C-alpha cells in the first residue's frame, strides 16, 4: 500500500516486478545511448527492443547530443520475458554519465522539461495508456546522476503528472 504526496505515490518494491501492465515506466537517461549500469541496465535487460530504439534515437543526434536534453522518448515495447505491453519513457536529463554527468541543477531543470514533454505525448494517446495514466519510476536521478531526491521530487510535484515511485531499501 502506498502513500500519496501531491502527484506522487510511494511504494516499497521492484519497479519491474510490481508495476501494472500495460504501464508507462520512466527513467532518467543520458543522451549518448548508454544503458550500461544502474536502473538503466535493468531496463536494457527487461526491454532489449526499447534499448535498440533508444540507442538509434541517440545516434541520430550524434552531432549534438545535447539537443535531446529536456525531451522524452516514449517507446512502445514488450517485456522480454512475459510479452506484456510496456511504454518506456526515456527522460533525457543529462548529456553524459559517470564522472562527466551534468550538474544537479541542470539535471533537475531538464527533468522538468522532459516530464512536461512526456505529459504532452500521453495527452495525445488513447486506450489503456493516455493523459491520465500514472507514470511508474524509480527515484530518478538519485542514483548514478547523484541528484538529491528532494530536488527531483519537487519538480515532479510541480509538473503534476501522477507518478508511482518504487523504493527499494
UniProtKB/Swiss-Prot annotation:
Domain of life, source organism: Eukaryota
Alphabetized GO MF terms: ADP-ribosyl-[dinitrogen reductase] hydrolase activity; phosphoprotein phosphatase activity
Enzyme Commission identifier(s): 3.1.3.84
UniProt-annotated binding residues for substrate: 13-15, 28-30, 35-40, 140-146
Gene3D superfamilies referenced in this protein's UniProt entry, alphabetically: Leucine Aminopeptidase, subunit E, domain 1 (3.40.220.10)
Keywords of this entry: Hydrolase, Protein phosphatase
Residue span(s) of domain Macro: 1-169
Catalytic activity: ADP-alpha-D-ribose 1''-phosphate + H2O = ADP-D-ribose + phosphate
InterPro entries in the cross-refs: ADP-ribose_metab_enzymes, Macro_dom, Macro_dom-like
Pfam family name, one: Macro
Family annotation (CDD domains): Macro_Poa1p-like
GO cellular component annotations of the record: nucleoplasm
GO biological process annotation, one example: DNA damage response
Family: Belongs to the POA1 family.
Biological role stated in the UniProt entry: Highly specific phosphatase involved in the metabolism of ADP-ribose 1''-phosphate (Appr1p) which is produced as a consequence of tRNA splicing.
Designated name of the protein: ADP-ribose 1''-phosphate phosphatase
Amino acid at each position: 500500500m502506498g502513500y500519496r504526496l501531491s502527484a506522487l505515490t510511494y511504494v516499497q518494491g521492484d519497479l519491474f516486478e510490481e508495476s501494472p501492465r500495460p504501464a508507462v515506466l520512466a527513467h532518467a537517461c543520458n543522451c549518448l545511448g548508454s544503458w550500461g549500469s544502474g536502473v538503466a541496465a535493468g531496463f536494457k535487460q527487461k526491454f532489449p527492443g526499447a534499448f535498440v530504439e533508444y540507442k538509434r534515437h541517440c545516434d541520430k543526434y550524434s552531432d549534438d547530443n545535447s539537443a535531446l536534453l529536456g525531451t522524452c522518448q516514449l517507446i512502445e515495447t514488450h517485456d522480454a520475458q512475459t510479452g506484456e505491453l510496456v511504454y518506456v519513457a526515456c527522460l533525457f536529463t543529462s548529456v553524459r554519465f559517470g564522472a562527466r554527468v551534468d550538474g544537479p541543477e541542470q539535471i533537475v531543470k531538464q527533468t522538468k522539461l522532459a516530464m512536461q514533454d512526456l505529459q504532452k505525448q500521453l495527452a495525445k494517446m488513447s486506450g489503456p495508456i493516455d493523459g491520465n495514466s500514472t507514470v511508474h519510476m524509480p527515484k530518478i536521478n538519485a542514483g548514478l546522476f547523484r541528484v538529491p531526491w528532494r530536488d527531483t521530487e519537487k519538480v515532479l510535484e510541480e509538473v503534476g503528472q501522477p507518478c508511482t515511485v518504487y523504493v527499494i531499501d
